[in-house]
């Protein structure tokens, strides 16, 4: 019975493990290297204004066009969000017949019955095009997925900042005698009919309202920051500036004063912005009128301009060429880089089926300040499931980072195509007797800049090191005659007004790489980034900088962790209780009765009085 009980408990533990898994991921598992790259680039960018923090996004139009306008077409979205896709571009249509915002580009005939059944696909036509649309599909389907992802990642370690981008369009018709028949077909006849769609722009994102960084919050921040600037107008000496103050001072010169990623994400606990990046609504008396409530929630071009470029023309490449060649024999054209760094603009580059992104073009766009939006229908051709990552992740994961080289961050054993020194540049160190001897120490804990990007390198190697101007973030100095190992680098090794630092944005990164070309020095070059104190927690501030994170377990994760063990333990206790109370061993029962009867018969035959002699 005991062996049977053990076997049953073992079987039950496996069964419960399948019911209450430790991981409840509904999408592909993100590998550790990619996760570390995402988190470390986010951490490095914390002091940078949120509009200049790079991100990548997807256009949902490509999903809808290839699979139809239904909730099934959104099945890949959750998986993409886990793969470093932080933006969602949505084409939103104002239906002039119903006065509703909808996702389908065509109006629905008024004889369609609206039911709660999901995926009820119908063929609808408009402007000589036919679409497959679900009348029940609305922006709530998209926002529910975003809301679920935000709640699952709402910790200091996992939280990222996201963007919802609207392209506003119209389902428009000209009012005339000939259009009366159109109104009879598409205009709702029953005012009590529950037509799917949203009345206002604000309603389209209402599910995410508690997570949205709004124009109202921006105005409050600007008001507070202006008061602080006015109250602290005393002259600061350069030497007294810490890095955070230096970054704030530089970006306070921007065309629009924006808060940092640190302020929005980890102080105000806001996770996304909503932008109207294009407004192509037809001018009409039936057109949607943007309200003050919309303006309080959603960013328009008057609040934060958006510039959209397309891969099918050369306009996006012009800026990249200008910045890459912004140097001559004597110096780097810092003004060109500062003009981009201080211009508060959302720069987007969108591809298509004819000119999709390549790994080379994508890296170029990301490095020169663009946010790529994947719009080609080939990205939606394959389902994203557990163990089956998206095409974007498989082909472009390494190219979505302006910082890390492909395959990084990773140690020497797992590194692919890493730049490793071919000569022994390890430093000398003193032994216990104070004598200097050649060191053979190896510690792949420090980060160096290579031609491909950042790489984890041996801290004891002697490289050049990057010195950044405290007051001008795009101005760098590289002393070609001085090499140090990471532990020996000090701010005093940099020229006056400069300090040992690292790029914190794509433009700062490009300005440093341009300086390398202008000064004609060799890679690798040390930057102020390491994971010495805690593995895979990359921090700046020298070798003694501390990791800001502690291992945290959310309530949901804790419940999932203990549920299998708790259920198994309870079942085992119940079985033990049943065994003790209800079960009797027949052999033991018979033995007890036999000896009791034998003793009674013995005393009956040998009944004494007194003490036997």
Curated annotation (Swiss-Prot):
InterPro entries: Telomere_Capping_Maintenance. Residues 1-17 form the signal peptide. Keywords: Glycoprotein, Membrane, Signal, Transmembrane, Transmembrane helix. The chain crosses the membrane at residues 558-578. It is found in: Membrane. Residues 18-557 are extracellular. Residues 579-613 are cytoplasmic. It is a single-pass type I membrane protein. One of its GO terms (cellular component) is membrane. It holds the Pfam family TIM-barrel_MTC6. Glycans are attached at residues 31, 111, 128, 136, 177, 202, 230, 242, 313, 328, 343, 375, 388, 417, 424-425, 479-480. Belongs to the MTC6 family. May be involved in telomere capping. This is Maintenance of telomere capping protein 6. It comes from Candida albicans (strain WO-1). The lineage of its organism: Eukaryota, Fungi, Dikarya, Ascomycota, Saccharomycotina. The gene is MTC6.
